[in-house]
Amino acid sequence: TTCYLSCSIGICLSGRAPKADAENVLASAQIALELARKEGPGATRSFSPKMRREAQKLHTLSAELEAALENGQIRPWFQPQICADTGELAGFEALARWEHPESGVILPPLFLRAIETTGMSGRLGEVILYHSLSALKSWDQAGFRVPSVGVNFSSEELRNPKLVEKIKWEVDRFEVPTSRLTIEVLESVVCQHDDDTISRNIRALANHGFGIDLDDFGTGHAAISNLRRFAVNRIKIDRSFITNIDKDSEQQIMTSAILR
């Protein structure tokens, strides 16, 4: 048997560290190493002062995260989904935004790293689901009919054996039909064949009538058989396929093939 090994490498030259002593150089190399690990096996990153500033900001956000979730600073912003054929509202997607009292609106690429660092993905999911269902209920009472709301669920949440029970409890609490809540799952999560809990949860949610959307389609390795296996209702083509679709004939061909 042949085993192939790889490693992630963080590099710091002594002249780039805040101070040229061993402790600072090693700490700076560790920051670069953490970023290399996030890029996957075999990645290499060289330290820069910008990395330290970002690491310090991440540390600050991580310390403030729990209070932000409890105080309602992190809430969903609702992005409309419009039917291209009719121009009518097809639903909303709930996008998490942190309305920080000092830094202003913080977008997911930054604070989701803090979420991962602190292991609070589940708590974030609970907050976004609660506010999304609450909004649906309020819109109904105001006479504003919204077909559905899509909520993103992380791989950590989808591994929770009690996830289906928790979501069902929330929709019953707000008296929202299951068909009006869409579960959005990243393609990379669906590709994790070895995780039976994830596949069981997604199938169970589909059986309860929840919509299943596959997000960022085209960035992973999801086969057509997986789309059937997970009872996917819709795929959301990754933006990399359509960014220059008006100029790139190959993108037009690939996107057309996916849609058909």
Where are these regions (language model features)?
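Cyclic nucleotide signaling catalytic output domains
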Residues: S8-A17, N24-E39, R45-T60, E64, ...
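Active-site core of bacterial EAL-family cyclic-dinucleotide phosphodiesterase domains
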Residues: L13, K57-I115, P147, N152, ...
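Catalytic core regions of nucleotide second-messenger enzymes
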Residues: T1-C7, R37, G104, D140-P147, ...
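Signal-transducing alpha-helical linker
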Residues: D21, R53-T60, E64, E70-Q73, ...
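Catalytic core of bacterial c-di-GMP phosphodiesterases, primarily the EAL and HD-GYP domains
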Residues: L13, A17, T44, A84, ...
